[in-house]
């Protein structure tokens, strides 16, 4: 069970200033979350393999493929400053 003091303590750790209404609301909401987590711990998970993903699929990214890009001249013509090879940007690190 989450108490008002628990919410105030966590808010203080997070450097949050909560109103009275927010403290009451957070006490109820966090209490409901803890209650739900406790219900989950009652589930019989014997024989169920642990998993890191909900679905049994991995590496679903597309493969790397070289594709045509804009011509260098087209890109450089839109740059405020360039040296015919690269875009020049202001120096920001000494």
Curated annotation (Swiss-Prot):
Task: Spell out the reaction equation it catalyses.
Answer: L-glutamyl-tRNA(Gln) + L-glutamine + ATP + H2O = L-glutaminyl-tRNA(Gln) + L-glutamate + ADP + phosphate + H(+); L-aspartyl-tRNA(Asn) + L-glutamine + ATP + H2O = L-asparaginyl-tRNA(Asn) + L-glutamate + ADP + phosphate + 2 H(+)
Q: What class of enzyme is it?
A: ligase
Q: EC?
A: 6.3.5.-
Q: What biological-process GO terms show up in the record?
A: glutaminyl-tRNAGln biosynthesis via transamidation; regulation of translational fidelity; translation
Q: One MF term from GO for this chain?
A: glutaminyl-tRNA synthase (glutamine-hydrolyzing) activity
Q: Does the keyword ATP-binding apply?
A: yes
Record Pfam families: GatC
Tree of life domain? Bacteria
What keyword terms does UniProt attach to this protein?
ATP-binding, Ligase, Nucleotide-binding, Protein biosynthesis
Gene3D superfamilies, per this entry?
Glu-tRNAGln amidotransferase C subunit, N-terminal domain
Q: Which PANTHER family match?
A: GLUTAMYL-TRNA(GLN) AMIDOTRANSFERASE SUBUNIT C, MITOCHONDRIAL
Subunit: Heterotrimer of A, B and C subunits.
- Recorded family membership: Belongs to the GatC family.
* Main function: Allows the formation of correctly charged Asn-tRNA(Asn) or Gln-tRNA(Gln) through the transamidation of misacylated Asp-tRNA(Asn) or Glu-tRNA(Gln) in organisms which lack either or both of asparaginyl-tRNA or glutaminyl-tRNA synthetases. The reaction takes place in the presence of glutamine and ATP through an activated phospho-Asp-tRNA(Asn) or phospho-Glu-tRNA(Gln).
Identification of the protein by name: Aspartyl/glutamyl-tRNA(Asn/Gln) amidotransferase subunit C
Organism the protein comes from: Caldicellulosiruptor bescii (strain ATCC BAA-1888 / DSM 6725 / KCTC 15123 / Z-1320)
Name of the encoding gene: gatC
